[in-house]
From Swiss-Prot:
Keywords: Ribonucleoprotein, Ribosomal protein
Gene Ontology BP terms: translation
Presence of the UniProt keyword Hydrolase in the record: no
Gene3D superfamilies in the cross-refs: 1.10.287.310
Name of protein: Large ribosomal subunit protein uL29
Name of the gene: rpmC
Entry GO MF terms: structural constituent of ribosome
């Protein structure tokens, strides 16, 4: 998901999406441990999405506009 797309979301929607991505990451890690995960790059992509969401939320807290 692109940062420009995420900037259109409200803070509440971003927080909900953040929780969803964290749950998804946990499930992916379980699948990896069980040997069921075939596409391991999904872990990397999910972690990057989490970082993007956290960055946008922090920018809004500090009043930084992009």
């Amino acid at each position: 998901m692109k940062a420009s797309e995420l900037r259109n979301y409200t803070d509440e929607e971003l927080r909900n999406l953040l929780e969803e991505k964290k749950r998804q990451l946990m499930e992916l890690r379980f699948q990896l441990a069980m040997g069921q995960l075939k596409n391991t790059s999904l872990i990397k992509l999910t972690k990057r999405d989490i970082a993007r969401i956290k960055t946008i939320l922090r920018e809004r807290e500090l009043g930084i506009r992009r």
